[in-house]
Structures are given as C-alpha cells and as structure tokens.
C-alpha cells in the first residue's frame, strides 16, 4: 500500500508529464549541486528539472500514458519537464552536456512520441520556433513583393509595346482614339 507522500509524488509527476510538451530523461551521476543549479538556470522558466525516484516516475509516466520510457528508469535519473519551446530546452541540455560530460541524455518524449538520445540531439540542432516562423514570414513577404512588382509591370509593358507598335509602323495601323489616349497617358 503506497504511503500518502508517495501517492502525492506520483500525482505531481503525472501532472508534470501531462502538462508538459516534452520530457527529457537524463543521468546526472557525478554532477555537483552547483552544476545542477546552473543547469536549472540554463533551462529557464520553460522547463522544470527534477531529480526523481525511478519507481515513482515510472508509475507516473505509465499513468500519463507514456510507457516507452520504462527501460530508461535506471540509475540516477532526473527529468526535464518542458512546457515551452522544446528546441530551446534541448539546446540548453545539449550545451550543458558538452561542458559537463557527466550529464547524459538518456531519452525523452515529445507530444507523446518517444525520442532517443540522438533524436533529442537532432532536435537541439533545429532553429527555434520563432526563427523558423520569421523565415517563413520573410519567404511569404518576398513572394508577395515579387507578385506585386509583376502585376505592376504588366500594364507598363503593355503601354511600351503599344507605343513601339504605333511608332514603328504608322502606315500599317492607325490607332483608335482610346488607344491614342492610353499611349499619351503613359
């Protein structure tokens, strides 16, 4: 029979799994308290980094519908519950792991899909959501300005062609009054 404290911990962890966009399991063996504090700061407000008990976390993950991480709950485990941009948090974890080789990224879950350590590192290599959105907006803006210049060029090109036609062969065709007005207006 679980104790009330353990039941409360499982409920809290289950809520963390359900309310986060992503969760990354890490092994923190050999890291000092100061290094863990630095890691928490680097993750920022969009992620909560918690040292957890494997059994309770495994139960909470299963209750939240996440069973793909079961094999990774071994050894000293901590979980980064990510509520913001998963790319930024993955970058923070990757960069911290480069500087502190004792931090090992084990696995993770993103929107219910299990991720390997390599997939998390690939996620960290992506540009942030804001950068990708700004690139997309820039691409749309560029296409709109190209279309606008094309539409502006069509009438002026027509008028230039009509002027050339009128000046090159006055004997072949006599422009109508409306065509003359259009040519003189340009």
From Swiss-Prot:
Keywords: Ribonucleoprotein, Ribosomal protein, RNA-binding, rRNA-binding. The keyword tRNA processing does not apply. GO terms for molecular function: large ribosomal subunit rRNA binding; structural constituent of ribosome. GO terms for biological process: translation. One of its GO terms (cellular component) is large ribosomal subunit. Part of the ribosomal stalk of the 50S ribosomal subunit. The N-terminus interacts with L11 and the large rRNA to form the base of the stalk. The C-terminus forms an elongated spine to which L12 dimers bind in a sequential fashion forming a multimeric L10(L12)X complex. Forms part of the ribosomal stalk, playing a central role in the interaction of the ribosome with GTP-bound translation factors. Belongs to the universal ribosomal protein uL10 family. HAMAP family: Ribosomal_uL10. This is Large ribosomal subunit protein uL10. It comes from Streptomyces virginiae. The lineage of its organism: Bacteria, Bacillati, Actinomycetota, Actinomycetes, Kitasatosporales.
């Amino acid at each position: 029979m679980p104790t009330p404290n353990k039941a409360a911990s499982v409920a809290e962890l289950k809520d963390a799994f359900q309310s986060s966009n992503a969760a990354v399991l890490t092994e923190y063996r050999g890291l000092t308290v100061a290094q863990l504090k630095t890691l928490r700061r680097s993750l920022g407000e969009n992620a909560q980094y918690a040292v957890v008990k494997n059994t309770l976390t495994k139960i909470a993950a299963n209750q939240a519908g996440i069973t793909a991480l079961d094999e990774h709950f071994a050894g000293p485990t901590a979980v980064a519950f990510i509520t913001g941009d998963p790319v930024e948090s993955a970058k923070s974890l990757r960069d911290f792991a480069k500087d502190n080789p004792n931090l090992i990224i084990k696995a993770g879950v993103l929107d219910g899909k299990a991720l390997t350590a390599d997939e998390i590192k690939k996620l960290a290599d992506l540009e942030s959501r804001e950068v990708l959105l700004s690139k997309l907006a820039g691409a749309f803006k560029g296409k709109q300005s190209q279309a606008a210049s094309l539409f502006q060029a069509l009438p002026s090109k027509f008028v230039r062609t009509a002027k050339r036609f009128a000046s090159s062969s006055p004997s072949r065709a006599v422009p109508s009054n409306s065509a003359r007005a259009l040519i003189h207006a340009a």
